Amino acid sequence: VLKKYDGLPTIVTTHDYLSANNEKKSVPIIDFHAVDARHNNAQMLWDKLISQHSQIFMVLSGHQHGQGLLIEKNDFGGKVYQIMADYQDRGQSGIDAGQPIDPYTGRPVGIGDGWMRLMTFDFSGSVPFVEVSTYSSHYLVDANHLDNYAAWYRRLEQPNMTDDEFLKADSYTLELDDFYSRFGSSSGL
């Protein structure tokens, strides 16, 4: 598909690729490459596929709890925005409903709390950008407008971040500053 549509801006979606520490690293207990050499781990996916195709400008992944962002240049010098978001382990809504903390893990039972990533692409200006936000269909609010957001989730997901850093990891703008030089102007979008 990449060869057939060479030059078309491409976003790759995959499962276990980026960690909450912004590393291309699989969860060790399910690193399929360690079990079967035919499987590719995250670094191999970068080395064999993503970095080798100039049209790939973004990678979206999940699986590892929390959020991550890594921006690197591919073998052609183009930026690749690698974004991870996974909220399935969140359980504040269960706590709100009276569900006890899991006695074995010391964590709420993860049901996700309806959190999802929203990405709005804007190609109207001289530099295109992506607005990234995090919204809960349960709480019906964006993460930046929920007073308890960092208090509920930061400790278990990103304990080394400040509350402000944690909020910024779930709501930010990415300028796609090399997009037009790679793919042409907005007239074709």
List each language-model region with its residue ranges.
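Metal-dependent phosphoesterase/phosphodiesterase active-site architecture
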Residues: 1-4, 66-189
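Active-site metal-binding loops of divalent metal-dependent hydrolases
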Residues: 15-17, 62-64, 86-88
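Extracellular/periplasmic head regions of type IV pilus-like filament subunits
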Residues: 55-60, 82-84
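Internal, well-ordered interaction modules that form the hydrophobic cores of assembly/scaffold domains
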Residues: 53, 63-66
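A short linear-motif detector with a strong N-terminal bias
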Residues: 37-40, 60-63, 108-109
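Divalent metal-coordination and catalytic microenvironments
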Residues: 12, 63, 119
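Active-site-proximal segments of metal-dependent phosphoesterases and phosphodiesterases across multiple
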Residues: 2-57
